[in-house]
Amino acid sequence: MRLAGPLRIVALVVSVGLTWIVVSILLGGPGSGFPRIQQLFTSPESSVTAAPRARKYKCGLPQPCPEEHLAFRVVSGAANVIGPKICLEDKMLMSSVKDNVGRGLNIALVNGVSGELIEARAFDMWAGDVNDLLKFIRPLHEGTLVFVASYDDPATKMNEETRKLFSELGSRNAKELAFRDSWVFVGAKGVQNKSPFEQHVKNSKHTNKYEGWPEALEMEGCIPRRSTAS
């Protein structure tokens, strides 16, 4: 029974000694600050150098455009929920955020020499007046760039003259555009050939991504500026 007191003292000394050893390990030794404690709160991922992000150029293009070219991105609307976007030279010409898009055809007219926006409007092709669209695209000047993004329904109100005018701007698909198709297109007044910048997806219940609508389309590229001499 007389050994109980000394044993308690020995146990206390051993306990203090072990505590000191653990603290020393955590602190990393004298003069080393708190690196070991910091390691406990550092995730393995944070110690690995993050991979560099891929650089994005104007309008989010993965590569820069050549000199005297205009960078663009055109995105059609998704069903009747998400509005379209038209970006040129890193400037958003039309979008839901700008509150200048709507059901039907969203069209931005751009000066082919300067790249400056002339006018941007949305035309309701379900319940609107097609004559408003015709008045907009009939008097275009030579070299005017025409950016088009569909939203919901681009074609119900289209007539033969409308389809002919878009075909003259370089469209291959305007003549067959139908109810709720998805369509993005970049053309120009006075072009001799068909535009390389056009995408079209038919509305089909067998292939539609959404219930009643095909997938949204996204197109990007570089358009050569029109020279003042041409």
From Swiss-Prot:
Keywords: Disulfide bond, Lectin, Secreted, Signal. Residues 1-33 form the signal peptide. GO terms for molecular function: carbohydrate binding. PROSITE patterns: GG_LECTIN. Disulfide bonds join C59-C87, C65-C222. CDD domains: ILEI_FAM3C. One of its GO terms (cellular component) is extracellular region. It is found in: Secreted. It comes from the Eukaryota. Residues 68-226 form the GG-type lectin domain. Belongs to the FAM3 family. This is Protein FAM3A.
